[in-house]
Amino acid sequence: MSEQNGQVRVKVDGLRKLFPISKGLFRKSTDFVYAVDDVSFEIKAGESLGLVGESGCGKTTTGRMLVKLDDATDGEVHIRNAGTDEMIEVMSIQSKVDQKEFRKSVQMIFQDPYESMNPRRTIFDIVAEPLSVQGIGTTEEREQRVVDLLRLVGLTPPEPFLFRYPHELSGGQRQRIAIARALVMEPTFVVADEPTSMLDVSIRISIMRLMLELAEKLGVTYLYITHDLAVARYMCDKIAVMYLGKIVEMGPTESLLENPMHPYTRALLSAVPVPDPSYRRPQVEIEGGVARAINPPDQCRFLQRCPFAVDQCRNDPHPDLYERGGDHQVACHLVTSEGNWVGGERVELDLRS
């Protein structure tokens, strides 16, 4: 990613999202799904933070709260306004005027390029809609802006695409349209929710390269949501690993991948496929299934599956995420403040790519 001034663009503090479980029309809910629980992180200008974890861990819910598609139960999200350079408290935005202003700085690229577009609208209408909603430019100016963006995202020549419909495009072309729609307002922060997961492998790398190039050209900051560590390594400056609503490890990409500390991160890395079919990577074994996210006890969320759990893990609250050497943070009772493992013998990871 491009080196900018190191200014914090996104600051998340104690973010929490609880979904009540309905008990009927006249009974108050006492049980809650802790989808996101006390999540905090910062993203600097020009950086890309990868939010990694298995399905259901709270990645997408976190992203939706950052762009105010979902309201938080608790916590704060501050995002720097592109126009005034001031930090906006996202959860306090209420009026339509403030929401429209907020959308100029923040956008989202959705996972499914087949479901996130209105099939009855042309490509021009889809990409130009944010400009129309904001009342920006004349029809001719909007058309020129759309043409320029289609060219920028690699749909050339752009003119034949303007009056096509989504069903006339391939999956890769639709995702390029989704990227163009997200960038038409020139946002400074974009949440990308697994934008390549539904595309053919042959197309994924071109979309990822495109997003990196646009970050360099336009200075866009990304929160990149993915379950694929290989994608996160290619796309992101930093990675945060999420498990059952909690961030369990976070750090610079190479530091985290070369020296994973949390048992869950190590298990994820050991499961990454190796290109050499004759080589079998040593597996980090974890037992059981993911624990229930309904009213979870105040313990380590990974306790039920961790092969190294000790009495401290069972008796103490979930460990805080704090630095264990450099900018590398991990939430584990068995990692010392210097980043040393004290939890017993582990399988040595062979991280050959």
Give names to the regions the model predicted.
Residues 3-8, 22-27, 32, 87, ...:
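Short catalytic/signature loops enriched in Gly
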Residues 86, 141-160, 213, 269:
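Conserved ABC ATPase "signature" region
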Residues 191, 195, 199, 203-281:
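P-loop NTP-binding/switch modules centered on Walker-like glycine-rich loops
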Residues 164-169, 173:
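Conserved ABC ATPase signature
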Residues 76-101:
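ABC ATPase NBD Q-loop/coupling interface
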Residues 52-53:
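The feature captures the beta-strand-to-loop junction immediately N-terminal to the Walker
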Residues 184-188:
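A short, proline-enriched helix->beta-strand linker immediately N-terminal to the Walker B motif
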